[in-house]
């Protein structure tokens, strides 16, 4: 691991989410790099106490963007994560909880089976009563955090909704594969529905292998290398034999960041070739361009009070920059370009757009207190824009934002930008 470029200037500190809420040098990129140097020199032991300072890192990569010396902290923390999974560095409870998460989250069919009994609970008055009663605290902070993120479960989450090939409407402009994501297809299936509809309406044929599973993002971000490689290999295999594709698209930035890293994860030319085809759906649509037919049918969206947006009263939308999109993939302008195509939308920028919301894969489950504080900070920042709704292009962020925006007096809806395009397109065809 090359820690030499770090000159300990401290430019990373104001951008670091863990340093913001914990306030200690060891919980900052600079402090962790100093610790890595000491470990490498034999001056410091990687024990359970030191490991906690690495575990406090969200992996948001804001420090990489901020660093004037080009320190690849992302590579340093990724190389360190597998070492943190040594049994002696975690308590039995921590190991058991992580084992549960990694046995469920990356496997859509298992997760669907686990969620089935909760369909009569999630999003109902019973759930609201349980939350108000304080009884959920008896579950412990980690299980309580899981419950706090549990959204209403749509019927579409419990069936495979798409054919293997969705044809392009009109002249075909491109042919793409679509990665559905494991958490997204269950907790927010409307996003994938919108993605398929918007792509097809723009003359893009969509291929959706029914056998596809998890891309490995959750395990990748936690250093579970063997499981990540297995999941990545299986996902690539599900796209084998589907024919030539112009791109492999994904509508969740956390997944996209991992998919684009398949070359280094699997260390093979075929994986690098697959990764080279991966694009965020917004990145792809912005670069290809919305079709003239699609643009012609985009209509104003409604305000929360039901009245349509207008030039005199535009719909105020705050765009949330997910860390693995902004810092991990360098995507910032493309989502804003797509949203600007909708008539009478006015984008409101958050004051601290580059600061993590606290979701960070499974961070808000394994580090619930720190994640909740970051969630409250981000919710206050977005609410302070005066926006009527929030656009978020990552499922983990969306769940986190809905939880913490919902704690306010005037909670804003959180929707994927592709859902807003779909709604505008439908309104123009009504």
For the regions a protein language model found, what residue spans apply to each?
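Iron-sulfur cluster-binding electron-transfer modules in prokaryotic oxidoreductases
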Residues: 73-430
């Amino acid at each position: 691991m090359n820690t030499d470029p770090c000159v300990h200037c401290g430019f990373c500190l104001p951008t670091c989410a863990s340093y913001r809420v914990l306030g200690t040098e060891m919980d900052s990129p600079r402090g962790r790099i100093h610790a890595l140097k000491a470990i490498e020199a034999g001056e410091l032991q990687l024990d359970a106490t030191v490991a906690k300072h690495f575990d406090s890192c969200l992996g948001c990569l804001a420090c990489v963007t901020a660093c004037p010396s080009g320190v690849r902290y992302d590579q340093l923390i990724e190389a360190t994560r597998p070492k943190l999974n040594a049994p002696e560095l975690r308590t039995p409870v921590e190991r058991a909880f992580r084992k549960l998460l990694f046995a469920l989250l990356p496997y859509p069919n298992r997760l669907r089976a686990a969620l089935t009994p909760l369909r009569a609970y999630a999003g109902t008055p019973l759930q609201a009563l349980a939350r108000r009663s304080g009884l959920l605290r008896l579950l412990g902070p980690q299980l309580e955090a899981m419950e706090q993120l549990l959204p209403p479960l749509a019927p579409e989450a419990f069936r495979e909704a798409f054919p293997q090939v969705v044809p392009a409407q009109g002249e075909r402009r491109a042919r793409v594969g679509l990665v559905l994501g494991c958490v997204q297809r269950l907790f927010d299936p409307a996003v994938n529905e919108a993605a398929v509809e918007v792509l097809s309406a723009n003359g893009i044929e969509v291929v959706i292998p029914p056998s596809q599973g998890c891309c490995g993002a959750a395990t990748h971000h936690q250093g579970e290398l063997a499981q990540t490689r297995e999941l990545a290999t299986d996902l690539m295999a599900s796209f084998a034999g589907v024919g030539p594709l112009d791109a492999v698209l994904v509508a969740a930035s956390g997944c996209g960041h991992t998919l684009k890293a398949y070359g280094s994860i699997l260390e093979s030319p075929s994986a690098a070739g697959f990764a080279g085809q991966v694009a965020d759906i917004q990145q792809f649509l912005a670069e290809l361009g919305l079709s003239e037919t699609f643009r012609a049918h985009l209509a104003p969206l409604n305000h929360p009070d039901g009245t349509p947006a207008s030039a005199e009263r535009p719909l105020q939308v705050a765009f949330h920059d997910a860390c693995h999109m902004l810092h991990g993939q360098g995507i910032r302008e493309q989502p804003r370009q797509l949203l600007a195509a909708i008539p009478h939308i006015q984008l409101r920028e958050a004051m601290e757009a580059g600061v993590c919301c606290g979701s960070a894969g499974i961070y808000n489950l394994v580090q619930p207190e720190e994640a909740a504080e970051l969630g409250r900070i981000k919710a206050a920042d977005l609410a302070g824009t005066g926006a009527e709704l929030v656009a978020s292009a990552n499922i983990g962020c969306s769940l986190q934002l809905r939880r913490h925006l919902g704690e306010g007096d005037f909670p804003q809806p959180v929707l994927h930008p592709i859902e807003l395009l779909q709604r505008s397109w439908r309104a123009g065809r009504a």
